[in-house]
Each structure stands twice: as C-alpha cells, then as structure tokens.
Amino acid sequence: MAAAFGGAGYSRRGRIENPRYSRLEVCAAMTLACALAASTVQAQSDPGYYRPLTLAPADAASSGGGGGDDAKAKAAELAKQLQNPIASLVSVPIQNNFDWGAGPDGDGFQYKVNVQPVIPITLSEDWTLITRTILPIVYQQNIVGTSSQSGLADTTESLFFSPSKPTKSGWVWGAGPVFLLPTATDDLLGAGKWGAGPTAVVLKQEKGWTYGMLANHIWSFAGESGRSEVNSTFLQPFLSYTTKTFTSFTVNTESTYDWQGHQWTVPLNFMVQQLVKVGKQPVAFQLGYRYYAERPADGPDWGLRFAVTLLFPK
C-alpha cells in the first residue's frame, strides 16, 4: 500500500500556469519511458517473461494436473497479502513520488524515492513482528527560495506486533512503536530531531475488498536544540479492490497534522496496481495520481506516483 505508508509536510501555494521543467524532471520522464519501452520489447520477444501470475506454466507444471488451479490460488493469496500493510510477506516497495506546484512562486518540484522494506519476524505461533522502514531519497528545487537540495531525508521505522490470525470477525490488527531517525544529509530535508510514538493499523479483507486505517503519532525527544520540535499525527485510511486478474484499484489519504503549526497536509491518492511475474520474480507495478485537498502555504498542488514492489513469498 504505501507506506507505503508515510507522510511529509510541505509548504503551500500553487499555481502551475508557467511550469519550468528541470533537466532532472526531463531525465526522470525519459528514464520511465525507456523502462516501459524496454519491458514492452522484452514481453514481445519472450511472452513468458512478463506475464500475469495466472499465466505461470512453470508453476502449473510443477503441481501436476491441478497445477493451474493451485497457481491461481497462490497468486490470489499473494495479491491479497499485497494489500495488507502487515502481511507476513517479505517485500521491498520502491516508491517514486513526483510533486509539482510547491514553493513561494508555485514552481517548486520535488522527487522523492521511498525505499520501504517490510520484514515479518515470527515471534511465536500466535504473534508476528512486522518491521516497516521508510528511507526517503529526495531531490527538490524552488521549494526553499530558488535553491535546490538533494540527499537522504529522515528515516521512519515502524514496528507492528500483530496476532498471526485474524479475529473471529475477520479483522487484522497490529500495534507498536514508531521511531523518527534524523538521517537527513541536508538541514532542509529533515527535522534534525529524534522522535518516537505509537503506531497502529486495523483492516479487513473480504470478497476482493480491503479497507482499514493506519495511524501514528510522533513526538521529538532529542536532537538539534535550534530546530523546531516535532509533534505530528499521521492518518492513512485506505480502500482497495482487487480483481480476479490481480489488478488493484486503491484510494487513500496520507494525511499529516502538524500540531506545532496547526496545519493539515491532506493528499488524496488514486492508484492502480498490477501483480505480474518478471521472469520468476513476483513484482507489483503501481501508477497513481495525487491531489492535495489541504496543504500549508507553499505546498504542492498535485503529484504522480510510480512504484515497483518486489515480493518474496515463503
């Protein structure tokens, strides 16, 4: 999902009547276009290379006569786990976020890559610990004056203790601590503070639907004395539907409330995701559009998302 689950505070304003595109933006667009073209060429030259999970002859052959049904069942379960942020599934989402319209003149741009490994650890027959890390790599320009910054931003680490089985009514939940680590390589990309607080997620999955909420709150407790304190709430309600061909349609918000500045940042995300196999590797590709319903004074107007998630089922 996402991760994806993390939020960022921006400043506001946002007109894009006269957008100015940097070489980085052009290169990013060209890279994406080349990647899509390369995958298309590969798919045409080898139809078995890039395919929906339902068309996995190697899996079917290994299971005998009923292999096709077995492969479909495994694919369906994998698609279901993909929509669960605390599933017992090792995954590595790489989320590319592009935002436009920020900064004092409304011509700011930010490109953020969130590397978000998810690792479940079995504690006992009844309990699992799920670690979710968000490591952001950022390039931005014209957001703080006319300058640009690039490098690592602050890392968020969430630990969810979750029952191994859903409740009798089908609800899945997890709770634990969340930590803010001051890993930013530029003062303008991070808070300069250590932070911690509670985090929790609750969700239900039935008949192809997944719906629920992820939330956390972080207070700073140490760090650079000259920097503002961190006191922020993150809320992510989500709703998704997965088809029989393992295409998922998702709508969510990744809302942050800054209690220091009394300001909401509310991006609405609309995303589509397809689960496929690249060679023998299960991979999910996601495209999304983001509209900022509420934002600080110099925040972005809108954004796009392209994500690739590598899956490592047991």
Per-segment meaning from a language model:
Residues 45-314:
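Transmembrane beta-barrel domains of Gram-negative outer membranes and organellar outer membranes
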Residues 1-73, 314:
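Cleavable N-terminal export/targeting peptides
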